Amino acid sequence: MNTRINRRTLTLIPRFLVLGSLLLLCSKVAGQQMYQLTQFMLNNYTVNPAVVGTHNYFQARTNHRFQWVGMNDAPITNVVSVYGPLTKSPMGFGALFYNDITGPTSRTGLVGSYAYNIALTDEIRISAGLSVGFMAFRVDASKFDLGDNTNYATDPALLTFQSKTSIVPDAAVGVYMYASHYYVGASCQQLIGNTLTLYGHPVRENALRRSFYAHGGYLIYLSENFDLEPSVIVKWSPPSPFQFDLNVKATYLTRVWAGISYRHLDAVSFMIGYRHDNRILFGYSFDFSYTRLRAYTGGSHELMIGYQFDKLK
């Protein structure tokens, strides 16, 4: 009798390990569900759909982030966006794709955006925007490693544990007020707040919680060749605490820039970038964590590449 109980317990151990790992990953994602970019100020569309149509040209941006380099299964994020105005109309549209991977879990999303802007004064305009699309949350069972003695092909506890994907609709809204030398905006991501369903059960611990953003920046002309742009972003995803980034970016001849950023309770970042022929942009940032993570990671790297199309007439 005791032997049977022990064998059954041993058989169930791999399943408990898998489910425990999944719950830990879910709790991690719940704390930081939205992807994180250090160079957000170079592409505010990633945090606010109202930004589309606020420039008189189309632009494309790609961001590639490698977070906590040196740690196993650390997050890797890729974002691609294209957006711009509708010719001779106070509106714009765009599309954004992202893929955010953390160990055996990944979040992939695609949204289309529309925004309409009006003039408040001769200098100031305000835009309201909406994004609608989908998000796919995937658990890749092949990336779980339970040790050399586990037979994934024949173990009855693992036969039913396979890769699963939960696809849900997603949406975001935002407002954005801007002038030639400053901007301020607010948005809500994951507006619908869906609950993911995996293995036939809703994973309520990993419900898509609404995330609120407030961001702004101010351009200061120091001289004919130099300008300075401080910016800030505040993020809140209840019940998680507020988080904010403070940034300062200095630009020379509108071509070369360097900056520093402070992320509350997380990291200090350094940024450099170059604009070629007023069309192609290259940006790089490095995050140095000042938390306990600094003992286990070599920092976070992020690369941004952009292209600016001709101005619309």
Label each region the model flagged.
Residues 1-36, 248, 299, 309-313:
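Bacterial Sec-dependent N-terminal signal peptides
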Residues 32-313:
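Subset of outer-membrane beta-barrel
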